[in-house]
Regions:
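Switch/connector loops and helix/strand junctions flanking conserved nucleotide-binding motifs
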Residues: 10-15
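Positively charged, polyanion-binding regions of nucleic-acid-associated proteins
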Residues: 97-118
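Short, cationic-aromatic polyanion-contact patches
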Residues: 157-174
């Protein structure tokens, strides 16, 4: 089974005048979609991820969004309504199948690299969030997924008042 999920890698916004339907302005959105942006959706797929018959295909697409300039601000943009959004180009794709694929995108090298003694230092969810840019509840969902895949484990000891995690070497879970 393959699940396909689009990621808006680039987006263009066009503003429509609600009076006559003409395009007022068009600009490129500063927001860029990344593979890690799907972290919050992965929690709901965690029962399937890790199964050799399951793969997740992420499509990096260019999107065009049209919004009505009917908002409450002077230019009508704040609180405006989306009129339509659709993909205009496929910029690339990423297929995640094996635990190593997920490690490449969701487990930063700084946290997965062992120290000089060969031990993986423990880290907290906050350290993981800072290293990856995954925020909020998605942080814990992603760590749960990485645990299920055998890439990280929860440590016995806490770090301050926080749970500790550590990366597992490939030979430890093989």
């Amino acid at each position: 089974m393959t699940v396909v999920h689009p990621i808006a890698a680039e987006k263009y916004l066009s503003w429509i005048d609600p009076e006559d339907g003409s395009i007022i302005s068009r600009r490129r959105s500063p927001k860029r979609g990344r593979v890690r942006d799907v972290a919050k959706e992965l929690y709901w797929l965690s029962d399937f991820i890790g199964n050799p018959r399951f793969s997740l295909r992420l499509l990096l697409v260019e999107m065009e969004e049209y919004r009505l300039a009917d908002g409450w601000s002077k230019d009508g943009k704040r609180g405006s309504n989306r009129y339509e959004i659709f993909p205009t180009a496929l910029l690339g794709d990423v297929t995640l199948t094996t635990p190593a694929d997920y490690a490449d995108y969701f487990l930063p090298a700084a946290l997965a690299t062992p120290d000089q003694e060969g031990n993986h230092p423990p880290f907290t969810a906050a350290v993981y969030a800072k290293a990856t840019g995954v925020r909020g509840r998605a942080t814990y969902g992603t760590l749960h997924l990485l645990e299920k895949l055998g890439l990280v484990e929860e440590t016995e000891e806490k770090i301050g008042r926080s749970r500790g995690y550590r990366a597992i070497s490939r030979h430890e879970h093989a």
